[in-house]
Amino acid sequence: RNKQIKSGEVKQEALWRDAWRELKKPIVIYYMLVFSGFWFLFNALFDVLPIHISEWVDTSVIVTSLFGSEGTSNGILQFWLGLNNEGTKVMPEGMLNLNAGLIMTCCFIVAALTAKYRITTAMFVGCLLSILAFVFIGAFHAAWFIVLAIAMFSIGEMMISPKKNEFMGNIAPEGKKAMYLGFVMLPQGIGWGLEGYFGPKLYEIYASKELFSRDLLLERGMNSTEVSAIPQGEAFTTLVSYTGESAQELTQLLYHSHNIGMAWYIIAAIGTISAVGIFIYGKWLLTLQRAQQAA
């Protein structure tokens, strides 16, 4: 292409004009739209799930299963498993470390298994796995189910994330692969921007332990002035001391008296729209390629 520009065969224009022309192509527009939903899911995992685990998931069950009821005092295990200082429960960041650990150890296996499939097929299946993971998070709050959900999402991510670069490289016109690889980041930016606003809002509406605790304090007889005076983040501990009930009992009460999973089902629904879009996009692209080959 550089030789063609120098010889005058191809006229070079401003990069932004060239990029804008490519961005307006249906193949790029549809790509950005259908894959933004997956990146909404991806960001929700790291943005909202840690709060969900902290508020609703008893991760001490995992430690008890592995080391007994007293946990472990081994500093190395505490560090690598992301346990608290007492070694009795897994911290939210420790749970999410499973995602990074699986990607580091299993990405080449997933890549080998998906290599024989069309790129859009692999990404479609990966998106379905990610959606199922969020349904699991919404349906169950048992610690081991959350571990399973994170593992499922990680496999889905491994099927999508590396393939997106390969896909964009394949559909890029000659001499514009670098530009198209830059376009890969656009759906991520759209998904991140939308999730950054709507993800926490959904959680606040359907699953906020803080708000539910304040409501229960009012129901149990605390006046509204006292409830309003409770510092942000301390409503549940106030509820425990006010009622005299255990934190575990109150957590179960709040969980079962509210539809906590709805936030995750809505996020999964967004992913479902994305998965359907990926499927249709893949079929459309295949038809387009066959038409070009026939011509």
Where are these regions (language model features)?
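Intracellular loop-helix junctions on the cytosolic face of multi-pass helical membrane proteins
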Residues: R1-F46, P50-S60, A263, A269-A295
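Loop-to-transmembrane helix entry
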Residues: D58-M104, A111, N259-Y265
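Helix-to-loop junctions at the C-terminal end of transmembrane segments
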Residues: T105-I119
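C-terminal ends and interior cores of transmembrane alpha-helices
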Residues: A111, L128-H141
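Hydrophobic core of transmembrane alpha-helices in multi-pass small-molecule transporters
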Residues: A133, W144-I160
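Intracellular juxtamembrane helix-capping segments at the cytosolic ends
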Residues: M158-P173
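A late C-terminal transmembrane helix in Major Facilitator Superfamily
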Residues: G175-A207
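A membrane-interface helix-boundary motif in multi-pass transporters
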Residues: K201-T272
